Design a protein with these regions (language model features):
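Internal, well-folded beta-alpha domain core
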Residues: 75-160
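A generic structural signal for short beta-strands and their flanking turns/coil linkers
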Residues: 1, 32, 44-46, 61-65, ...
Length: 160
């Protein structure tokens, strides 16, 4: 059965990269003594996947991880055991059982909201609100994307 785990990442843990967060959860799952499913083969790994990785230095109140387990007592028990095995800066906020045909966590993320905070005395020297309004009022926001096959222009306005 597959679980969708929602967690917070905050405080000093915000400076930990995505691969280290994955390793943390592998160890936390073992410490919490969860009945995690493993891949077959010569080098078995826990079957888990994350939604979009959070950039280094950013905090989040809504990160998602899918974890496959063989059995569980209850979602609340999994939440408590993982929180007990966790470190300050990572907190499990919810655990849900997913239907068998549910998509992965990444496919479930439709949008993200960001909040920008400035340190005291470090406010921008321009009106941020009007700058954002001018930016969003543009008909096109073109950037050049460089790939192995060459470069091409992309209109960011379609994704905003």
């Amino acid at each position: 059965m597959k679980l969708r785990i929602k967690f917070r990442k905050y405080g000093p843990v915000r400076f930990i990269g995505h691969l280290d967060v994955m390793r943390f959860f592998q160890k936390a799952n073992r410490r919490a003594e969860l009945d995690v499913a493993y891949t077959g083969g010569f080098s078995p790994h826990q079957i888990m996947s994350f939604a979009a990785p959070l950039g280094v230095g950013l905090t989040s109140n809504g990160e998602y991880m899918d974890l496959e387990v063989h059995s569980l007592t209850s979602c609340e028990d999994v939440k408590q055991r993982l929180n007990a095995a966790s470190v300050p800066g990572i907190e499990i906020t919810s655990v849900k059982i997913l239907p068998d045909k549910a998509g992965n966590a990444m496919a479930s993320v439709a949008a993200a909201g960001y909040t920008v905070a400035f340190r005291e005395g470090r406010d921008p020297h321009f009106d941020l609100s009007s700058a954002v309004d001018r930016f969003l009022a543009k008909d096109e926001i073109l950037i050049t994307k460089e790939t192995k096959k060459g470069s091409r222009e992309i209109n960011l306005k379609e994704g905003i």
